[in-house]
């Protein structure tokens, strides 16, 4: 295989060379796709840059990121985090990415503005039992809890699923949101073949979660 550049008007000439069997255009340069998240999720339509557009940026709303420890310091989160329970947990950076997608302000680069740039972000260390969610919801008005962690294949509708469903049922303003699709090559014993075991963790089987 030979890669080369040549003028478009020479394509016919090139194709007539006897030892050339096949000609194809090269792929376009790769582009990061995560920056299109706001438009894919339509959050750009409720928090627009237009003077007369909607400005719902989640100001006054509290959310929680259950992840791998302290987030930042970063100007995209300045003045909007509560991290007292992870103050000395400085090891991971997965939570920084998740928090940025959720509520980055786009101060450093507007292209990376998150879904809810005005939200107050409570940061906690992830635990599969999601402890104290109800307490945070009741005491600090935290509405959305985001957990982008998996803990192996599902074991069906477990006692943990029941616990989370019950908490949500009794506290209607509490919303649990989980990652999915990150284990798309797994079967997880479903019997449908590779690609079906893409939701990891017992709590993700609950009926009232997103």
Show the residue positions of the predicted features:
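Extracytoplasmic/secreted envelope proteins and their assembly/folding machinery
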Residues: 8-11, 17, 95, 99-102, ...
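Subtilisin-like serine protease catalytic core
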Residues: 46-129, 140-143, 154-157, 169-175, ...
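Autoinhibitory propeptides
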Residues: 1-51
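Active-site neighborhood of phospho(di)ester-bond hydrolases with catalytic His/Asp-centered motifs
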Residues: 146-148, 176-181
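Alpha-helical scaffolding within the catalytic cores
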Residues: 127-135, 194-198
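Glycine-rich, charge-decorated loop segments at or immediately adjacent to ligand/cofactor-binding or catalytic sites
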Residues: 182-205
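Active-site glycine-centered loops adjacent to acidic/histidine catalytic or metal-binding residues
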Residues: 67, 164, 181
């Amino acid at each position: 295989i030979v890669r080369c550049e040549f003028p478009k008007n020479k394509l016919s000439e090139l194709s007539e060379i006897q030892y050339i069997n096949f000609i194809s255009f090269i792929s376009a340069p790769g582009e990061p796709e995560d920056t299109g998240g706001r438009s894919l999720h339509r959050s750009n339509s409720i928090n627009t840059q237009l003077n007369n557009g909607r400005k719902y940026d989640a100001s006054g709303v509290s959310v929680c990121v259950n992840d791998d420890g302290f987030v930042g310091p970063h100007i995209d989160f300045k003045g909007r985090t509560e991290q007292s329970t992870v103050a000395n947990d400085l090891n991971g950076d997965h939570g920084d990415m998740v928090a940025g997608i959720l509520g980055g302000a786009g101060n450093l680069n507007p292209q990376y503005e998150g879904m809810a740039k005005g939200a107050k972000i409570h940061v906690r260390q992830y635990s599969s039992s999601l402890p104290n969610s109800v307490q945070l919801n009741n005491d600090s008005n935290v509405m959305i809890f985001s957990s982008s962690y998996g803990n192996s294949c599902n074991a069906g509708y477990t006692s943990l699923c029941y616990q989370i469903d019950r908490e949500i049922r009794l506290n209607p303003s509490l919303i649990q949101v989980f990652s999915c699709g990150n284990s798309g090559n797994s079967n997880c014993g479903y019997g449908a073949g590779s690609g079906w075991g893409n939701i990891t963790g017992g709590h993700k089987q609950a009926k009232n979660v997103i």
